[in-house]
């Protein structure tokens, strides 16, 4: 997936009100950018970190700049939570995720419970439907382990129950974690920050929900899904 251009590099000054982030660009300009990430962004919003922002000339926008990447731990980390669904849509269209290849139709944002929409519904005349939920992951604190979530994620825990309900009806259901960083070699649910979600993921897997974890290759020009990572499952409690 090509990132919007032009891009500019700068240094983070502060993030505030969740969706605003001030930076000083390398050319000296002081800007306020949209931060398209409602999460805690642990270790990725600290003053002094280098970051990359894209510029839009759309006059309807209140903020012309959008935060896309942060330089952390010697590499680039994708922090735009809108991008994982775009990455997955592109990968599905190209059959670039072997476990999810071969479906005849890919439908985004399909309602599958009273108050939920699944990210993608994959269908084929000769297969059960596949309900696919996508989560962005960019938290790392221990070696090469990627963790999700980085804060309490009650809505994400509900999605796991919705996926398990589809499996009970005879469908296939997949929870896909898109890891927007290049320095991780395995994945785990973050038990201490959200034990309810960690237990929910284990219970969902025991109920037949498949868990996939894919790492990305990242540059200031492009992000693409590249490599399957193992899931280090925590025992259900």
UniProtKB/Swiss-Prot annotation:
NCBIfam families: sfsA (TIGR00230). Pfam families: SfsA, SfsA_N. PANTHER family: SUGAR FERMENTATION STIMULATION PROTEIN A. This is Sugar fermentation stimulation protein homolog. The gene is sfsA. It comes from Caulobacter sp. (strain K31). Belongs to the SfsA family. It comes from the Bacteria. One of its GO terms (molecular function) is DNA binding.
């Amino acid at each position: 997936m090509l990132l919007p251009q032009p891009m500019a590099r700068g240094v983070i000054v502060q993030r505030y009100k969740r969706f605003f982030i001030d930076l000083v660009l390398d050319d000296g300009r002081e800007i306020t950018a949209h931060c398209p990430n409602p999460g805690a962004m642990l270790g990725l919003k600290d003053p002094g970190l280098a970051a990359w922002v894209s510029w839009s000339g759309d006059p309807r926008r209140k903020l012309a700049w959008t935060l896309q990447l942060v330089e952390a731990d010697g590499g680039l980390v994708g922090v735009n939570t809108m991008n994982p669904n775009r990455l997955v849509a592109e990968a599905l269209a190209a059959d670039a995720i072997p476990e999810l290849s071969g479906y005849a139709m890919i439908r985004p944002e399909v309602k599958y419970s009273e108050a939920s929409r699944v990210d993608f519904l994959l269908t084929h005349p000769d297969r059960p439907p596949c309900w696919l939920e996508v989560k962005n992951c960019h938290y790392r604190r221990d070696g090469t382990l990627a963790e999700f979530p980085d804060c309490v994620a009650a809505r994400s825990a509900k999605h796991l129950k919705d996926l398990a309900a589809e499996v009970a009806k005879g469908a296939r259901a997949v929870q896909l974690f898109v890891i927007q960083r290049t320095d991780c070699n395995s994945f785990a649910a973050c038990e201490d920050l959200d034990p309810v979600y960690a237990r929910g993921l284990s219970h969902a897997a025991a109920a037949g929900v498949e868990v996939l974890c894919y790492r990305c290759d990242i540059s200031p020009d492009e992000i693409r899904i590249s490599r399957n990572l193992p899931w280090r499952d925590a025992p259900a409690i």
